[in-house]
């Protein structure tokens, strides 16, 4: 019998880090940027074919965060709720960091604008997080 480590599952640490890092990426890059010439592999992974849909940077960043979280679920390390809540905790940590960073800039700066994992949008400027409707 193999004993599992005496650590808690909730919330998933990898998902928390992924949520924080991906939130920072969405703040720093244009989420609406459409990736040029996307490709997809064939069924056995030996050939890359043109992908006919459009891929937005923000959607791909969100997918990256989700893949980190879900991968840990598939490994049996976490429950799905551990990962989902970990992403949100990481997102909140990143928003706090961005809020503080917005007060430290000497240059003229309109702030960070980004979408959250729930689809809502925020603007962060002068130490304030403004939720847009």
Residue ranges and their predicted role:
Residues 1-133:
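Membrane-embedded catalytic cores of phosphoryl/pyrophosphoryl-handling enzymes
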């Amino acid at each position: 019998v193999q004993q599992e480590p005496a650590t808690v599952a909730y919330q998933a640490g990898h998902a928390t880090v992924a949520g924080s890092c991906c939130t920072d990426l969405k703040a720093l890059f244009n989420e609406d940027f459409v990736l040029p010439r996307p490709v997809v592999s064939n069924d056995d992974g030996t050939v890359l074919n043109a992908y006919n849909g459009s891929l937005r940077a923000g959607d791909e960043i969100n997918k990256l965060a989700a893949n980190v979280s879900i991968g840990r679920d598939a490994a049996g390390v976490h429950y799905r709720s551990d990962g989902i809540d970990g992403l949100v905790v990481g997102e909140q940590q990143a928003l706090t960091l961005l809020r503080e960073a917005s007060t430290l800039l000497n240059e003229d700066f309109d702030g960070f604008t980004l979408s959250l994992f729930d689809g809502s949008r925020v603007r962060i400027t002068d130490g304030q997080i403004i939720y847009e409707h």
